[in-house]
Amino acid sequence: PDASEEELNAAFKHNTRAMFGETIANPALTVLDIEKFAKAAHAHNVPLIVDNTFPTPINCRPIEWGADIVTHSTTKYMDGHGAAVGGAIVDSGNFDWMAHADMYPGLCTPDESYHGITYAEKFGKEGAFITKCTSQLMRDLGCIQSPQNAFILNLGLESLHVRMPRHVENGQAVAEFLENHPKVEYVSYPGLKSNKYYETAKKYMPNGGCGVVSFLSLIHI
């Protein structure tokens, strides 16, 4: 996330098809400057995909900052108990696949396994990607939750808006305690004013990020 615009642009190759980042990276807890990365991705005609697992949509909405596709590991905060493995894909419908048809043949040429449909033509940019995910990729890969796992996830989602502020509050308290502990060498938590990503975190996550704290102890086991 610390790359300059020049470094970002230099990273793109002729076969680059997407840019990927994490809102808050695990485990380093670096914070993505979503607008900067979206600008770079779109300048090279590729979508920005953001993993928003740690903040969840309660604390950050990457699509509003330029992300095209957002992913979540629902096993963490959305589930709330780590009881059911799962994931989610959210498509903004903003990326124009057909405008770059030569780069995305899977979306812009007929899919013979699905009645010869060309997703970008049939569903437009608003539905091409997510329809391919649900109609073809889920069919071929089998990534469908069991009814019990879906039930557990739905229960967790009901309380997500209540739990996330508490997670942030607890994470902040733990981070501040560790930062002042003589046996701790370094603490990484975007909510600390001493953290290099503090201002970026406040921009994209004004209500806080998550409850995860990373630290380096002076105690060697």
Where are the regions a protein language model picked out?
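Short hydrophobic/aromatic beta-strand micro-patches
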Residues: 90, 214-216
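Conserved glycine-rich beta-strand-loop-beta hairpin in the small C-terminal domain of fold type I
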Residues: 172, 188-213
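Conserved small/polar residues in nucleotide/adenosyl-binding loops
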Residues: 219-221
